[in-house]
Amino acid sequence: MAGENHQWQGSILYNMLMSAKQTRAAPEAPETRLVDQCWGCSCGDEPGVGREGLLGGRNVALLYRCCFCGKDHPRQGSILYSMLTSAKQTYAAPKAPEATLGPCWGCSCGSDPGVGRTGLPGGRPVALLYRCCFCGENHPRQGSILYSLLTSSKQTHVAPAAPEARPGGAWWDRSYFAQKPGGKEALPGGRATALLYRCCFCGEDHPQQGSTLYCMPTSTNQAQAAPEERPRAPWWDTSSGALRPVALKSPQVVCEAASAGLLKTLRFVKYLPCFQVLPLDQQLVLVRNCWASLLMLELAQDRLQFETVEVSEPSMLQKILTTRRRETGGNEPLPVPTLQPHLAPPAEARKVPSASQVQAIKCFLSKCWSLNISTKEYAYLKGTVLFNPDVPGLQCVKYIQGLQWGTQQILSEHTRMTHQGPHDRFIELNSTLFLLRFINANVIAELFFRPIIGTVSMDDMMLEMLCTKI
């Protein structure tokens, strides 16, 4: 009977008997499938009927044999198919809600027309809500009563977040709305002024300066805020006392170490083969331009540490007496005074370095020590500083430019062989040379060499050291 083709096959009675047979049959073990449920193939679309009827004089079966799973499925468009698909959508597990970035506070459409109350401008009613261009939802218009209530409740019930470090106070301390006067909310030009405005920096709403809402939270914060310790001003801030004169705490030890470092620096430069082929005048041009930077690299390599003390500035009476003594004594130089912690040296004899200038030297030394620069890396950095093609008065520019480029190439190859991150190490080493721009050569001369050489200029001393054997 199962293999025969009966004439009532496809009728309602045949389908009911076949369904009862499949229901009372012993359930078979479900096979493991790659897909949870099969929803038929394209055979269910032919013929496309919405109701069970007679298409072309022939009965249309409610079920069809699937080409994928081999089972019977209801035809698409039939009543049975619609019932099954609607039941599937009803009992399907709800999807997890997507994570939203935060509440949307509308677009610029809420400002047109800018009204403070809901009224009839121009004889047309203004809707309290508008459709947002970003999220597609309805938001209250800015300046309306509903908008003010929502923004006020948002600021009241939201948990206070930790304040971020800002360079100049809170966002509402900006002068963006300071040009709008008025301590009370009024109607300038017949229009009501909104209590809040949209900030251009953070995109949030803040109360206007001068309004009652602005004065209330600011006064509360000022009354209840705990006194915090103000951060120290940086060394380049002239208003924090960074221009106060300082001197070495142990001048004899530090000056001797600096003199030894200068001798080693000039010995390193003088006996370079590529430097010896230059004329004496070109050698002098290069050394006079970069001796201070080369000395700083040498002091960093020797790990020279020094301390300074503050000295008092000379009074007007001391300046007058010093000038009169020099006029009466002729051109005889003043004796070098013994540097004591709080004894002011004569202002005409030398300019005492300031605390900010000395701090720039210490910052450079600390930067070099933090990188643990090797001896070869110090030598390549010295070569980069020495062969500077931008020095004024230099004639062999192409030759010096080639030497600097070759030194940088050797340094790059060395860092690639000794470190895994070649570009990071190479950039860090060259970044130390940028700090040398904040160090003045006259400050180094006054701090380390003036107590020893007196009134002799550093240029004359460089010429003497280049001409003599050291």
Curated annotation (Swiss-Prot):
Superkingdom: Eukaryota
SMART domains in alphabetical order: HOLI
GO biological process, one term: male gonad development
Keywords, comma-separated and alphabetical: Cytoplasm, Nucleus, Receptor, Repeat, Repressor, Transcription, Transcription regulation
Gene3D superfamilies associated with the record: Retinoid X Receptor
InterPro entries: NHR-like_dom_sf, NR0B1/2, Nucl_hrmn_rcpt_lig-bd, Nuclear_hrmn_rcpt, Nuclear_receptor_repeat
CDD domains: NR_LBD_Dax1 (cd07350)
Keyword match Cytoplasm: yes
Residues spanned by motif LXXLL motif 1: 13-17
Sequence repeat residue intervals: 1-67, 68-133, 134-200, 201-253
Region (4 X 67 AA tandem repeats): 1-253
Short sequence motif AF-2 motif: positions: 461-466
Listed Pfam families: Hormone_recep (PF00104), NR_Repeat (PF14046)
Ranges spanned by the short sequence motif LXXLL motif 2, renumbered to the chain: 80-84
Motif LXXLL motif 3, residue range(s) on this chain: 146-150
Any one GO molecular-function label of the UniProt entry: protein domain specific binding
Subcellular location: Nucleus; Cytoplasm
The family this protein is said to belong to: Belongs to the nuclear hormone receptor family. NR0 subfamily.
Subunit structure: Homodimer. Interacts with NR5A1, NR5A2, NR0B2 and with COPS2. Interacts with ESRRB; represses ESRRB activity at the GATA6 promoter.
Notes concerning its domains: Homodimerization involved an interaction between amino and carboxy termini involving LXXLL motifs and steroid binding domain (AF-2 motif). Heterodimerizes with NR5A1 and NROB2 through its N-terminal LXXLL motifs.
Function: Nuclear receptor that lacks a DNA-binding domain and acts as a corepressor that inhibits the transcriptional activity of other nuclear receptors through heterodimeric interactions. Component of a cascade required for the development of the hypothalamic-pituitary-adrenal-gonadal axis. May also have a role in the development of the embryo and in the maintenance of embryonic stem cell pluripotency.
PANTHER family: NUCLEAR RECEPTOR SUBFAMILY 0 GROUP B (PTHR24081), NUCLEAR RECEPTOR SUBFAMILY 0 GROUP B MEMBER 1 (PTHR24081:SF1)
Protein name: Nuclear receptor subfamily 0 group B member 1
Gene that produces this protein: NR0B1
